[in-house]
């Protein structure tokens, strides 16, 4: 499917590529939002929280020193992504895992499509420049090319901003997971 899309992006005009890029950017943002929503749903679902000690965490929490508790908390933080990945194999977990996996796959596909569109824009511009050198272009198309170049630059900047925002949200989510792990760990007296 991606190969077909890449080949069609090379035959599109720069304006069509810009519109396709905008569409792909919107899909990428929507998929990123779905990932965050799915993660939020998992965190808000108490049935997914580990209230009983598993064999591996029981061994680390029964230690008398604080470092064992810290390592159990760190394992809980690292294990959150493992938890969502292991649920896809039918290992158990909430229904939110399939939503998270679907959103993640959708995000990866839309980013790949967006990159293909952005990579095709320079090729389209080169083809347009070649046409202009051969006398097939017009001054109007130069203005159009400049406008589309600005739009492509704007799209790239918007992607960068959205990626920074998604990274910040993921960092906040990690902090929240760490807090939840701390609240769930047994108190040592």
Swiss-Prot record:
The lineage of its organism: Eukaryota, Viridiplantae, Streptophyta, Embryophyta, Tracheophyta. Residues 138-178 form a coiled coil. This is Mediator of RNA polymerase II transcription subunit 30. Keywords: Coiled coil, Nucleus, Transcription, Transcription regulation. Its main location: nucleus. Belongs to the plant Mediator complex subunit 30 family. Disulfide bonds: none annotated. Component of the Mediator complex, a coactivator involved in the regulated transcription of nearly all RNA polymerase II-dependent genes. Mediator functions as a bridge to convey information from gene-specific regulatory proteins to the basal RNA polymerase II transcription machinery. The Mediator complex, having a compact conformation in its free form, is recruited to promoters by direct interactions with regulatory proteins and serves for the assembly of a functional preinitiation complex with RNA polymerase II and the general transcription factors. It comes from the Eukaryota. GO terms for cellular component: mediator complex. Component of the Mediator complex. It is found in: Nucleus.
